[in-house]
Amino acid sequence: VNVVAGVDLGGTAINYTIVNEQEQFLIEGLCEHPALSIQGPEVCLAQIEDGLKIAVELAGVSFDDIVAVGLDTPGPASSSGVLSARGSTNFVHADWSGFDIRKSLEARLSRPVTYLNDGNAGALWGHFTIFGANSRETSVSAVIGTGLGGGVIVEGNVVKGRMGFGGELGHVLVPYQSIAGIDGLHPKCNCGRTGDLESLCSLTAIALTLLPYFLPRYPDHELAKFDSSKAAKFVRGMAEKGDPLCRDVFRVQAHALGLFFDEMVNTFDPDALIIGGGAIETGVDFQRWFIAETRRGMPRQRTEQADIPIHIMPNGDTAGARGAAIEALKFTRAR
């Protein structure tokens, strides 16, 4: 039996999945192993291999059944898997700088390895859940977490770009001045831009920008007693329960996302828009409210595009590994 493995290498943990040729995932939920990436590439690659042996056992297959491996990591990295000298958190060991993780893992496992960054892997998973692995459709995914990740899939293929920065959707500027109720707000992103999507639609945006802006309007609010980075973690749950301040925060996030999606509709004319990430890992009622607010934030669409579907990405924790596996499955089919 031929299977493909997906390996989602995070800063502290590696998440695995196994998929067969029928596009069935053989591991339900999370299969995690410590990454130890802080100790450098050699230790981390050994961890990836050790965890893979545990994953195949859990999936009920053997290591020899693996015909290809899909890997994803946080960026910045080239489209072929060479990690940037400006490594992300936990990839700070000197040996990671300029390290070709795809080629090195391929040599270690003696199998072809494909590479995506974690945002693009999540986007491919979201696309697959709607259209399957052999699709020719186009979709745009926004993944709302600590930052704003995501990706663009054009005619079934991930847009990686010349240097691997395709789909860095968080740093696309949006005309936020048109959002109601935020006069005088100047949302700044850690990248140096003012008014990109991440500066308004992320956990970081809640802590740095939106809570400090809205809290003075609610002087007796229970979140006022926390510092904003701690308070930010309560906003989603309170918004889901209907708290007016927290709904205001999520309304601004949804309207910013709507402005961004409008730009994507005009650029790609996609078949679907997809929202993922921890921000909307909520009950269905709140997800429906958030989608409706996102549509409300979009400028009026052409009649032909007005009914573009907006989906919620399922299986948030496993999205990276599953997207990476789909990329490797597509590779094996193209050979």
Describe the function of each predicted region.
Residues 3-50, 84-88, 164:
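Short glycine-rich, Thr/Ser-proximal phosphate-binding strand/loop in the N-terminal lobe
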Residues 4-8, 65-70, 139-143, 149, ...:
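Short glycine-aspartate micro-motif
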Residues 36-49, 65-69, 75-138, 183, ...:
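Glycine-rich phosphate-binding loop and adjoining helix at the ATP-binding site
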Residues 48-69, 112-113, 261-273:
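Phosphate/pyrophosphate-binding loops at sites that engage ATP/ADP/AMP, CoA/4′-phosphopantetheine
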Residues 131-200:
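Glycine-rich phosphate-binding loop of actin/hexokinase-like ATP-binding domains
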Residues 193-272, 306-308:
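A mobile "lid/hinge" subdomain adjacent to the ATP/sugar-phosphate binding pocket shared
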